[in-house]
């Protein structure tokens, strides 16, 4: 999705926030999700911070892969779907702040991204590039001292049959998320007013 489209989607989410907050529970997973999906290993809080920096490169490499199997494609698809559920990683603190209402869903898409990267180590055409990314991640983690950092979601495994949603009901308790969504809602409202004013003279002149 292009940046403008993502901004519009964020603004729409912000405008619908009261409805979302009223109808979702803490880190609610999709109702009725089966347990027949593929399990995705947990990711530590420290790993998240580094893998988030390499996510675009990992997904781009995976998307170009030709000789893939169904499990790989399912995990890749889950990583991208979960990323959109987590507002494309745009919410402040979603990766680094354990208290963020978006932290668990960030764990989900980054755990899936890591699983995709690990799978590419065994793929003939992608193995070299995947190995280079893994080495860079290992170096970054050691340099930043993130290897042993954990949080409440660090031991949580995920499943491709279950989408992790943000904890909308906790957004008002998280200042950074609340400020971001409030600002986007205000921007969306202002854009609507400007659009109406631009159209009004044209409508009057056509009468």
Language-model segments: residues:
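Hydrophobic secretory-pathway targeting helix
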Residues: 1-38
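Soluble mature domains adjacent to a membrane tether on cell-surface and organelle-surface proteins
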Residues: 25-161
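Short, aromatic-rich amphipathic segments at membrane interfaces
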Residues: 150-180
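Selective detector of the "anchor" transmembrane alpha-helix that sits immediately C-terminal
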Residues: 171-200
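Cytoplasmic C-terminal tails of single-pass
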Residues: 200-207
């Amino acid at each position: 999705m292009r940046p403008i489209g993502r901004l519009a989607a964020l603004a729409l989410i912000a405008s619908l926030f009261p409805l979302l907050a009223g109808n979702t529970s803490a880190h609610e997973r999709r109702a009725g999700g089966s347990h027949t999906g593929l399990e995705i290993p947990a990711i530590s809080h420290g790993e998240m911070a580094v893998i988030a920096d390499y996510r675009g490169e990992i997904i781009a490499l995976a998307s170009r892969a030709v000789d893939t199997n169904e499990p790989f494609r399912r995990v890749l698809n889950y990583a991208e779907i979960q990323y959109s559920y987590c507002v494309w990683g745009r919410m402040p603190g979603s990766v680094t702040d354990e208290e963020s209402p978006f932290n668990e869903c960030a764990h989900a898409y980054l755990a899936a991204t890591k699983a995709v990267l690990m799978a590419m180590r065994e793929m003939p055409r992608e193995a070299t590039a995947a190995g280079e990314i893994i080495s860079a991640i290992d170096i970054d983690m050691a340099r930043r001292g993130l290897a042993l950092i954990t949080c409440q979601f660090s031991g949580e495994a995920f499943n491709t049959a279950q989408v992790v949603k943000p904890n909308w009901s906790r957004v008002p308790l998280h200042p950074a998320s609340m400020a971001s969504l409030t600002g986007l809602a205000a921007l969306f409202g202002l854009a609507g007013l400007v659009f109406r004013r631009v159209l009004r003279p044209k409508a009057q002149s056509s009468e």
